[in-house]
């Protein structure tokens, strides 16, 4: 996991892209992996940024292996050759 912050029982990261379109394209690609893992983040889009927050609600809002696995997968998703 690259540049994820662990605070308040959550893993957090902001992904930064060159444009709004790249940010949205990344979210679309990420949604495929999110559905595959059936582990859904809280996330927001702010122009060229996507803020992602991971925690496992059914384990008492704590960080679990599910969160770490999704974080690692999200780190590998590229848009136009960039992360």
PLM feature spans:
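Short aromatic-glycine-(Arg/Gly/Cys) micro-motifs in beta-strand/loop hairpins
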Residues: 1-10
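Short beta-strand
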Residues: 4, 42-45
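Short, well-ordered beta-strand elements within core beta-sheets of diverse protein domains
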Residues: 10-18
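Short amphipathic alpha-helices within nucleic acid-binding modules
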Residues: 19-28
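Solvent-exposed alpha-helix faces
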Residues: 28-29, 72
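A common structural junction motif
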Residues: 31-39, 78
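Disulfide-stabilized extracellular beta-strand modules
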Residues: 47-57
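C-terminal structural segments of small proteins and small subunits
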Residues: 55-83
């Amino acid at each position: 996991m690259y540049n994820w912050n662990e605070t308040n029982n959550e893993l957090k990261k902001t992904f930064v892209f060159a444009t709004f379109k790249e940010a949205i394209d990344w979210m679309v690609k990420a949604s495929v992996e999110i559905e595959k893992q059936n582990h859904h983040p809280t996330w927001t889009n702010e122009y060229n940024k996507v803020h992602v927050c991971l925690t496992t609600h059914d384990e008492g809002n704590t960080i679990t292996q599910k969160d770490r696995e999704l974080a690692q997968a999200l780190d590998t998703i590229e848009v136009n050759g960039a992360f």
